[in-house]
Amino acid sequence: MKVYFVFLCLLPSLISGASILPEPRKDVRASASNAEIQSLAEQFYAADTNKAASGDITLNLQYKASSTQTSSGTDFASQKLFNYVNEAKLFARPTFARLVDLLDNYVHTTGTAESVPTAEVNEQNAFIDEIFKTSIITKLSDFFISKGYYSSAASFKTDLKEMWFGLYTRTSGPLDSSGFEHVFHGEIHKGKISGLHNWVRLYLLEKSGQVNYLSYSSDGVWNGYPDIYAFQLKWSTYLKTLGSFFIGSSPEFDIAMYTLCYVTRPDSLCSVKMGGSIFQIQTYTWANSTYGNGKRYVASSYPNI
């Protein structure tokens, strides 16, 4: 009799095609306020012990382009952007060293499948392991756990690797891209530079003669590092009309700032703060493919100046 009664109760759902499974648990995450995000960004700024000191980087900005000049592709700078970078000091630091290891792993032209052999997977893991030793990533992890975004540091670590290093296609063809490749390495997509928002990569490209610095269009208000700039440049013959960068920051700082905004303010402008000055980071999710339970990969993230 009880079985018959239960069946009658469920019959309307079965007829209508509705699921009889329990509804998924509702999102229990506490919303992160703008004030909390800005406060945490300030903590990252104060805790970035691996950042460049004032004498570790010397820039030669040369010409400031107007808004009408940035898209012209004109070379207003006769000299290189980076006069000096203290590689012996900065690149010997573990998180920098692990980042540099990753930067030769990618085919920069979209449309070509990315091969990820075991050695490169090991380099990804080594980079993530290293940044998780820093106080910046610890602060980020603790914040996410306190807000219910993740249940543990281990679950956050697993998800961070997937959101940044998981492969997807930007060309409706082979798996040719990832959030990390786009933001930290840079790509050539549809005849233009796409992504490329990491200063270490920019420096190494210019040092090797692959990038030609053209001009700058924005200089942040900060006197020390990290600072924020917007540049115009060419990678081979391909143009970047406006590329924004943290300059002098550590790899863990960049990852933390971008991930904080990506998780809490996806596909939008995210207000953060450094040294008392507010600015915004733009994040984009990759909507054409997902991983896990409908999660989206990083498409892009950069300072919006």
From Swiss-Prot:
Q: Does the keyword tRNA processing apply?
A: no
Enzyme group, top EC level?
lyase
Keyword line: Endonuclease, Glycoprotein, Hydrolase, Lyase, Manganese, Metal-binding, Nuclease, RNA-binding, Secreted, Signal
Catalytic activity, reaction form: ribonucleotidyl-uridine-RNA = a 5'-end dephospho-uridine-RNA + a 3'-end 2',3'-cyclophospho-ribonucleotide-RNA
Localization: Secreted
**In the record, which residues are listed under signal peptide?**
1-17
Q: Which residues form the EndoU domain?
A: 33-305
Regarding protein family, the annotation reads:
Belongs to the ENDOU family.
Q: How does it assemble?
A: Monomer.
- Its protein name is Uridylate-specific endoribonuclease D
Q: Which organism is it from?
A: Xenopus laevis (African clawed frog)
What's the encoding gene here?
A: endou-d
